[in-house]
């Protein structure tokens, strides 16, 4: 028996299984009883059931700082036992899948993600738009580039776009904090990003309107986007911007407004150690390698380097929406704006 095995005599002899079950019937989240039940099942050779009770005890215990001191050693043992069983289970499942041809490097990425979820290595993230939800759309974190025939042509313009960016960056005041306060709206601290220049933007288009002075400074960038299916909604989109993240900055987890669009990133100035998360998937930016993602799925970003990171960021229609559906979405938002007396909507990319 390994050093992580449950004690065979001490606790279990003090409370038999019937007594443990009676306690759990009355108090299903009794941590001590859950651990004792797990120990009993482990001694009986039922590793799978024991694992579920150890996990239940860990969940019932709550945050470590709230656990009574005398219970902490037992919880540490429960965690060790659960992790050992989970590792054994994972090794078995992977062994069986490998025997049937599964290879993490070449097999279906969607299946690989489902495997990580079923093994408890990743959690499920779904669309949670903060403003408008269009039902029936697939839950995809990062989209496959093959769905966007215009993407390769845009990437070929990376150097020209980056040159225009460098000219803009000669005037740091051209960038403004991405998250800005509005006196007509309740304050929202945005986890420290409100009016924070660590995350800044230089807009070519903003909320469906061209920023003429800025666009005139970046003609190659504007030309490169001519064939892109931008999500055109009056007073709302597209927004096209250079998004700047200062050294050491972290954009906290957040969700976008509407799930009828996707966000595209074209990395332009990437020093390394710059990471982006959408749902349960992490990716590093690399210059000239664009991607599209659903921003209504929780996402966040880090610049862990000592240099500035800048990307070209814009929104496009989701490819699953028909032309009729796109037109109806536009009409809906126009009606909402008209009801508001023509006031500019509270909107962001």
Where are the regions a protein language model picked out?
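Conserved structural position within tetratricopeptide repeats
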Residues: 24-25, 59
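A short hydrophobic beta-strand segment most commonly corresponding to one strand
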Residues: 262-267, 292, 307-322
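Conserved metal-binding segment of the jelly-roll/cupin
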Residues: 284-298
């Amino acid at each position: 028996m390994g050093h992580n095995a449950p004690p065979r005599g001490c606790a279990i002899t003090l409370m038999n299984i019937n007594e443990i079950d009676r306690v759990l019937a009355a108090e299903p989240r009794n941590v001590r009883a859950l651990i004792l039940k797990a120990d009993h099942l482990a001694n009986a050779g039922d590793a799978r059931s024991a694992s579920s009770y150890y996990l239940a005890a860990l969940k019932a215990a709550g945050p470590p700082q709230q656990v009574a001191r005398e219970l902490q050693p037992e919880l540490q043992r429960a965690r060790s036992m659960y992790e050992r069983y989970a590792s054994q289970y994972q090794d078995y499942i992977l062994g069986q899948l490998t025997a049937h041809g599964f290879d993490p490097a070449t097999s279906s990425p969607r299946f690989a993600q489902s495997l990580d979820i079923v093994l408890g290595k990743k959690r499920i993230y779904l669309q949670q738009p903060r403003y408008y939800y269009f039902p029936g759309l697939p839950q995809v974190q990062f989209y496959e580039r093959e769905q966007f025939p215009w993407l390769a042509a845009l990437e070929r313009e990376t150097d020209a776009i980056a040159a225009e960016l460098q000219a803009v960056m000669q005037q740091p005041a051209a960038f403004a904090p991405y998250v800005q306060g509005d006196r007509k709206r309740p304050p929202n601290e945005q986890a420290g990003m409100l009016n924070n220049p660590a995350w800044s933007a230089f807009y070519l288009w903003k909320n469906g309107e061209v920023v003429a002075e800025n666009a005139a400074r970046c003609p190659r960038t504007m030309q490169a986007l001519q064939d892109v299916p931008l999500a055109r909604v009056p007073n709302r989109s597209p927004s096209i911007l250079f998004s700047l993240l200062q050294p050491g900055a972290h954009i906290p987890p957040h969700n976008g407004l509407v799930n009828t669009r996707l966000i595209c990133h074209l990395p332009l100035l990437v020093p390394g150690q710059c990471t982006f998360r959408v749902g349960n998937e992490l990716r590093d930016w690399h210059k000239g390698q664009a991607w599209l993602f659903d921003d209504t799925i929780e996402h966040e970003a880090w610049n862990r380097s000592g240099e500035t990171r800048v990307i070209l960021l814009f929104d496009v229609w989701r490819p699953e929406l028909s032309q009729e559906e796109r037109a109806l979405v536009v009409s809906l938002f126009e009606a909402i704006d008209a009801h508001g007396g023509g006031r500019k909507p509270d909107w962001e990319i």
